[in-house]
Regions:
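Two-metal-ion RNase H-like nuclease active-site motif
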Residues: 2-11, 169, 423-425
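Active-site cores of enzymes that catalyze phosphoryl transfer or operate on phosphate-rich substrates
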Residues: 4-18, 455-505
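Short His-Asn-centered micro-motif
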Residues: 7-9, 68-70, 101-104, 425, ...
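Conserved DEDDh/DEDDy metal-dependent 3′-5′ exonuclease domain
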Residues: 33-196
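Short active-site loop/helix that positions an aromatic residue
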Residues: 107-118, 428-442
Length: 775
C-alpha cells in the first residue's frame, strides 16, 4: 500500500515551513468533479468557488513552521517526516509513503535532507534556520549552473542522504523543468526554460493564482537587517530596493498569509495529480513491470531508460559497453542517403531527384536543406525537418452520408460514383518503420540488434493495439501500449540529439529524406491517375477520393506498400477545417460497437482544450477556439457561444513574463495616471472598462503593453460573481475568432499580402438571405 502525500517547503532568513496534504483525502473530497465520461475536470467547471474552499477545508493536511523565536512545532515536524518511513502494519502489509512535490527532486527533497541532517547538530533553532537558509541559497544559485549543481560536494551529500520516503517530482514527470527553450545569443547554446507552479496552475483553471508577496519593509523589520553586515545601517528605502523577497525576515503577523500561500501551492500539486492521475500511475506500472525507476521521469527520459534496458538485452552488451558513444559526421552526401528504389516517373520529379543526389550538407538543422517541388496543383517543401505542402486554409466536407471501409472501424458504401470522401492516408509509425525495414541505425551501434529491436517493438505495438486481453506477455495491456508508444516515438528524435547515445546525423537524414521521397512517389502516382492530393505532411496526405476511383486507389496503395515496405491506414473525414498544418479541427467517420459516430480531433488554435492536453503549453482564451469549433461544426454564430459561456476563466489570457521584468497596472484616478505593481504572473480578461497592464523592465524601465494594449480586468483570485456582471469585451473575442474563421472561409493564407485581402473580403462568404427563405 502506498500513502500518497503532496508537500512543499518554504524558507526565509528566519523562517522554515513544510505543508503536507493527503492525496488520498484530496481525491476522495473531489471524486465527483468529473465529466460525463468519468474523466476528471477542473474544479471550477463543476463547483462554485465557495464550494471549492469549503471542500478544501475537509481535506486532511498538516502544516509546520519554525522561526528564530518559535520552535514549538519543530519536534512535530521531525516526527511527521520520520513517520513516512516504510513499515509493516499488523496484517503484515507493507505501508510506503510517497511525497509528491513540484521541483522537489532538486529542491524540497534536499531541504528535508538538510533539516534531518542538522536539527540534532545545531545548538539553537536560529542556527538551524540559518543552515537551512544557506542551503536554500546554495541550491537556488546553483540551479542555473549545471556543472556546479552536479559537482557541488555539499549538494551531493544531501542527494545521497537516505530519506525515509520516496520522492515523486511532478515537474519532471510532465517535463515542466524543460517546458521551452531559449537560444543564447552569444553562444548559440539552447537552454531549457522551466515552467513554474503558478504558470502551470493557470492550465488547471485553479481558482487562486497566488504569488508570495510581503508588504514593504517597515521600521520593525528594518532593525533585523542590522545583523547582516552588508545591509547594516541602510534605511528602509534602500532595503526595499536591495532585499529580494526570499531574503526577507518574516514578522509574526505575516506568518498566517505565508502559510496560506504555502498550502495553496500544495493544493495545486494535488490538483495536478487528480487531473492527470493516469500519467502518474503509468510511472508506477512501468517501474514495476520492467524493474526500472521512472517515478521522476518525463516520457522522454522514460524512453531513454527503457531503450537502455531493451537494447542491452537485444545486443547482449552491458550499458557501459555501448553508452556514451556517438557518431560524428562532417560532409553528408545524399548519394549515401537516398535508397536505390526511390524512382519517379515524370520528368520534373526525375530532375528533382537528380538534384537531390548531387547534394551534400554539413548539418541537419531546419535551414540546412530545403527544396520546393510542384506535383499537380500543390507545391511541396522537402527539408531536413520533414515534408509539408504549401497549403491555404481550407474547409472540406465529404459528400454522401456513408463510409468507405476505414481503419477506424466500419464499412459502408457511398451513394454513387460521383460521391466522394476526403481521406487521410497516414503511414503507420513512419520513422520507426523506415528504420526497421531499411536497416537504418547509428554507426556506433549494432545494426541488426538496433533494427530488430525497433521492428519488434513496432510489431508488438500493433499486436497490443488489436488485443482484447487485459494482459499481453504478462504485462498490463495499457501499460505495455504506453511503453511501446513512448519508446518508438522517441527513437527518431534521439538520433539527432547530440548529447544522447543514438546520435548519428546520417541516420537522421536516411530516415527523413527517404521518408519524404517515398511520400512524393505516392503523391506522383496518385496524381498520374487523376486522384488529387490536397495536402501533405511528414507522414500523411489528404486526398479527395471519388467512389469510381476506389479500386485504382487500392492498387496504387498496395504497389507503394510493396515497394517501400511501409504500411498506411486510410481514415475518412467527415470534415476537415484547417488554418494550417498545426491548427485544425476534423471529424472522422467511424463505427464503434455497431454505432455510427463522428470522432473529433483538433489541434492548436482550433482546440479548446489544448491548454490541458500539454501542461508545457500556454493558456490563451479557450472560449475563442470553442466558438470557432461551434461555428463550423454546429453552424452556431460566434457571438452566441461567447454570450452563453458561464466560466470566466475561458476568456482569460496570460503572457510569459521573464524575471528581468515586473508587471504594472496603469490606471487613471482623479485625473492622475498611477502605476500599481502586480504579481509577475497575472491572469486577465479583456473588458470594456479596466486597466492597461504592462511589462516593465526592472533595469531600464522600458514598457511593453500586454493584451495588445486592450483594457483588461485582472482575475488572479476567482470569486463567484455572475459572468453577466464581468463586463466582458465580447467584440474583442469575436474579432479574435474571426481572425481564424475568415482565412478559412475565404481560403486565403493570412501571411504576407493575404492579410490585406482577408481584411478587404472579411465576412463576404456569409449569405445575405437564409436559403430557407426561398423554399
Amino acid at each position: 500500500m502506498i500513502n500518497c502525500i503532496a508537500y512543499d517547503v518554504e524558507v526565509l532568513r528566519n523562517f522554515f515551513s513544510i505543508t503536507f496534504v493527503s492525496i488520498n483525502s484530496y481525491l476522495k473530497v473531489f471524486k465527483d468533479c468529473v465529466d460525463s465520461n468519468g474523466k476528471a475536470i477542473p474544479l471550477v467547471q463543476k463547483l462554485s468557488v465557495e464550494e471549492i474552499k469549503a471542500r478544501l477545508e475537509k481535506v486532511e493536511k498538516h502544516s509546520f513552521y519554525i522561526t528564530y523565536t518559535d520552535d514549538s512545532q519543530l519536534l512535530s515536524m521531525i516526527d511527521y517526516i520520520n513517520k513516512t518511513r516504510c513499515y509493516k502494519d499488523s496484517n503484515g502489509t507493507i505501508i510506503r509513503t510517497d511525497l509528491y512535490g513540484f521541483n522537489s527532486f532538486n529542491y524540497d527533497n534536499l531541504m528535508i535532507a538538510a533539516l534531518l541532517s542538522f536539527y540534532m547538530r545545531t545548538n539553537s533553532t536560529k542556527e538551524l534556520i540559518n543552515k537551512l537558509y544557506e542551503t536554500s541559497k546554495t541550491i537556488i544559485s546553483s540551479q542555473d549552473d549545471k556543472d556546479k549543481f552536479r559537482t557541488d560536494f555539499y549538494l551531493n551529500s544531501l542527494r545521497k542522504y537516505k530519506l525515509p520516503f520516496t520522492g515523486v517530482d511532478v515537474m519532471r514527470i510532465f517535463a515542466l523543468n524543460k517546458a521551452s527553450v531559449v537560444v543564447d545569443s552569444k553562444t548559440g547554446e539552447r537552454k531549457p526554460v522551466p515552467k513554474g507552479l503558478k504558470q502551470t496552475s493557470i492550465n488547471l483553471q485553479w481558482y487562486e493564482l497566488l504569488e508570495y508577496e510581503l508588504p514593504d519593509i517597515n521600521e520593525k523589520e528594518a532593525e533585523l537587517y542590522n545583523e547582516i553586515p552588508n545591509l547594516k545601517g541602510m534605511n528602509i528605502n534602500q532595503l526595499n530596493k536591495l532585499v529580494d523577497k526570499w531574503d526577507r525576515f518574516i514578522l509574526d503577523e505575516y506568518i498566517e498569509p505565508m502559510m496560506y500561500y504555502n498550502l495553496n501551492d500544495v493544493f495545486i500539486v494535488a490538483e495536478i495529480i487528480r487531473l492527470y492521475s493516469e500519467e502518474i500511475k503509468s510511472r508506477y506500472a512501468i517501474s514495476k513491470a520492467y524493474d526500472v525507476d521512472v517515478l521522476n521521469s518525463s516520457r522522454s527520459k522514460t524512453a531513454d531508460i527503457l531503450f537502455e534496458k531493451f537494447y542491452s538485452k537485444f545486443s547482449g552488451l552491458a550499458p557501459e559497453q555501448w553508452k556514451g558513444k556517438k557518431t560524428e559526421r562532417t560532409a553528408m552526401s545524399f548519394k549515401k542517403v537516398i535508397f536505390p528504389f526511390i524512382k519517379f516517373k515524370t520528368k520534373p520529379m526525375q530532375d528533382f531527384l537528380d538534384e537531390c543526389l548531387k547534394t551534400t550538407i554539413y548539418r541537419v538543422n531546419k535551414d540546412a536543406f530545403s527544396k520546393e517541388v510542384k506535383i499537380g496543383n500543390v507545391t511541396y517543401t522537402v527539408a531536413t525537418g520533414g515534408l509539408h505542402s504549401q497549403d491555404n486554409p481550407v474547409e472540406l466536407w465529404s459528400s454522401g452520408r456513408e463510409l468507405f471501409p476505414s481503419s477506424t472501424g466500419g464499412q459502408y458504401d457511398v451513394l454513387n460514383d460521383d460521391d466522394y470522401v476526403y481521406i487521410h492516408a497516414d503511414i503507420n509509425s513512419m520513422y520507426p518503420s523506415i528504420i526497421a525495414a531499411h536497416k537504418v541505425a547509428p554507426a556506433h551501434l549494432d545494426t541488426n540488434a538496433f533494427c530488430n529491436l525497433i521492428g519488434g517493438l513496432k510489431n508488438k505495438r500493433v499486436e497490443v493495439k488489436h488485443s482484447d486481453e487485459d494482459t499481453v506477455d504478462g504485462i498490463d495491456r495499457d501499460t505495455l501500449a504506453l511503453v511501446l508508444k513512448i519508446v518508438i516515438n522517441s527513437v527518431y528524435g534521439k538520433l539527432g540529439f547530440e548529447n544522447g547515445n543514438l546520435y548519428d546525423r546520417l541516420a537522421v537524414l536516411k530516415t527523413t529524406i527517404n521518408g519524404q521521397l517515398m511520400m512524393l512517389m505516392l503523391v506522383e502516382e496518385l496524381e498520374l491517375h487523376n486522384i488529387h492530393v490536397l495536402s501533405a505532411n511528414t507522414d500523411g496526405i489528404v486526398i479527395k477520393l471519388y467512389k469510381r476511383d476506389i479500386d485504382v486507389y487500392n492498387r496504387i496503395k498496395d504497389d507503394w506498400e510493396q515497394t517501400t515496405k511501409l504500411k498506411f491506414d486510410t481514415d475518412y473525414y467527415h470534415c476537415l477545417v484547417s488554418r494550417d498544418i498545426n491548427n485544425y479541427l476534423s471529424q472522422f467517420r467511424v463505427i464503434k460497437n455497431g454505432v455510427h459516430k463522428l470522432k473529433l480531433e483538433s489541434k492548436g488554435a482550433l482546440n479548446p482544450m489544448m491548454y490541458s492536453l500539454d501542461l508545457t503549453k500556454g493558456y490563451s482564451m479557450p472560449i475563442v477556439a470553442q466558438a470557432i469549433e461551434n461555428y463550423f461544426l454546429k453552424n452556431k454564430p460566434v457571438m452566441d457561444t461567447l454570450q452563453e459561456a458561464t466560466n470566466i476563466l475561458d476568456f482569460c489570457l496570460t503572457q510569459n513574463v521573464g524575471k528581468q521584468f515586473h508587471v504594472e497596472e496603469t490606471k487613471i484616478e482623479n485625473g492622475q495616471v498611477t502605476h500599481v505593481v502586480c504579481q509577475r504572473y497575472v491572469r486577465f480578461y479583456v473588458s470594456n472598462r479596466g486597466y492597461i497592464i504592462e511589462k516593465v523592465h526592472n533595469d531600464n524601465g522600458s514598457r511593453s503593453r500586454m493584451a495588445a494594449g486592450s483594457v483588461v480586468t485582472v482575475i488572479n483570485s476567482l470569486d463567484d460573481k455572475d459572468i453577466s456582471l464581468r463586463d466582458i469585451n465580447f467584440k474583442f473575442y469575436y474579432q479574435e475568432a474571426m481572425k481564424v474563421i475568415n482565412p478559412i472561409k475565404l481560403k486565403i493564407s493570412p501571411k504576407g499580402k493575404g492579410k490585406s485581402k482577408i481584411k478587404k473580403y472579411s465576412g463576404m462568404y456569409n449569405p445575405i438571405f437564409n436559403e430557407d427563405d426561398f423554399g
